[in-house]
């Protein structure tokens, strides 16, 4: 297993409680307050935002914004009115790129209006997508054809570069059919370790079950945040072999790679959400120089809800001077 590059994540959460945890393979984690946009857009309860800083993000991508959308299950609870609201969200945010995490529809006829809405204002640096388990069970050819028609790049089992100036970042896509994990190794395995790589996977379990070497950040969905939970903290049904571990938000696989799991927008089986708000995820990338001094760590971890002060957690290996950032092999 390759060693991970040090990655600094400055995270603005929208959950009731933000808990910072020291995690293997990550040099610094800062939880920097919270922002919640609640009820502004019909059918989308919140926009969860993350600021992601890494030495492997090129300077030209500093401030680059990615909108991640998954599990629309259109129409389910996500009706015509809320579809229009999604279009408004995309328009107002005006991201540089859009990434789609699968489970788009509850019927083939709903795919085109969904993609048409998302791509009404095409992002400058493109849209990138994978399939979810629902999309593999039905409408697969229709979905892939419509991706092509709306200039959405289908990235399963491949990796593509997003070019900006003379630099680039890479987005890769995993195939999630559960039974195909061993047959479909991660498309990140042969990527150059110095690149900043985002891996799209429908289920977060893939990031734990597979070797995803050379991946800097995983974006996943599928769990719906439990869809029905006890006060947002405990879900009887998680749609994950790992229980609550990858239910929502930022977590880490055993290798220490960050996995962001969105609660998504729509529903499946039963049209109800309870303490599992629908959301889209907005990432802002920041180029971080290896020579920059890091924030002084707070030894005490504050777990109070609605954090207003940054919390810095630095593993012991990073207290050395000068700061040596481990690199991927």
Predicted regions and their residues:
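Membrane-embedded segments
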Residues: 60-145, 150-153
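Solvent-exposed loop/turn segments at secondary-structure junctions
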Residues: 72-75, 104-107, 133-137, 160-162, ...
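Acidic, His/Gly-rich catalytic cores of divalent-metal-dependent hydrolytic chemistry
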Residues: 25-48, 255-326
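Active-site neighborhood of phospho(di)ester-bond hydrolases with catalytic His/Asp-centered motifs
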Residues: 69-70, 97-103, 126-133, 155-157, ...
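Conserved beta-sheet core of the metallophosphoesterase superfamily
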Residues: 119, 204-281, 289-290
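Acidic, histidine-bearing metal-coordination/catalytic regions of metal-dependent phosphoesterases
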Residues: 2-65, 76, 312-329
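Beta-strand-turn-beta hairpins that frame and shape the catalytic cleft
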Residues: 45, 54-67, 152, 160-173, ...
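Binuclear metal-dependent hydrolase catalytic cores centered on His/Asp/Glu-rich metal-binding motifs
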Residues: 87, 144-145, 149-152, 158, ...
């Amino acid at each position: 297993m390759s060693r991970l590059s040090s990655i600094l994540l400055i995270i603005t959460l929208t959950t009731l409680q933000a808990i910072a945890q020291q995690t293997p393979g990550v040099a610094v984690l800062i939880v920097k307050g919270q922002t919640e946009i609640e009820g502004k857009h019909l059918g989308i309860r919140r926009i969860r935002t993350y600021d992601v800083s890494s030495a492997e993000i090129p300077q030209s991508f500093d401030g680059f914004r990615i909108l991640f959308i998954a599990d629309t299950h259109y129409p389910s609870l996500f009706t015509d009115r809320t579809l229009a609201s999604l279009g408004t969200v995309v328009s107002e945010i005006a991201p540089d790129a859009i990434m789609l995490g699968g489970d788009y529809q509850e019927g083939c006829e709903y795919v085109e209006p969904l993609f048409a809405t998302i791509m009404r204002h095409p992002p400058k640096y493109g849209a990138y997508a994978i399939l979810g388990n629902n999309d593999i069970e039905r409408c697969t050819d229709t979905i892939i054809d419509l991706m092509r028609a709306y200039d959405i790049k289908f990235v399963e089992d491949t990796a593509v570069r997003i070019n900006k100036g003379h630099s680039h970042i890479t987005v890769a896509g995993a195939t999630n059919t559960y039974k195909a994990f061993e047959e479909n190794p991660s498309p990140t395995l042969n990527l150059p370790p110095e690149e900043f790589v985002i891996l799209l996977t429908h289920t977060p379990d893939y990031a734990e079950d597979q070797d995803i070497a050379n991946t800097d950040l995983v974006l996943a969905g599928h769990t719906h945040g439990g869809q029905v939970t006890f006060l947002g903290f405990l879900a009887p049904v998680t749609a994950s072999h790992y229980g609550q571990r990858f239910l929502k938000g930022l977590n880490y696989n055993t290798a220490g790679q960050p996995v962001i799991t969105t609660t998504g927008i729509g529903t499946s089986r039963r049209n109800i959400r309870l303490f599992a708000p629908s959301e889209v995820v907005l990432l802002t990338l920041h180029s971080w120089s290896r020579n920059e001094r890091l924030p002084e760590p707070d030894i005490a971890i504050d777990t109070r809800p609605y954090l207003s002060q940054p919390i810095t957690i630095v593993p012991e290996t990073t207290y050395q001077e000068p700061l040596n950032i481990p690199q991927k092999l």
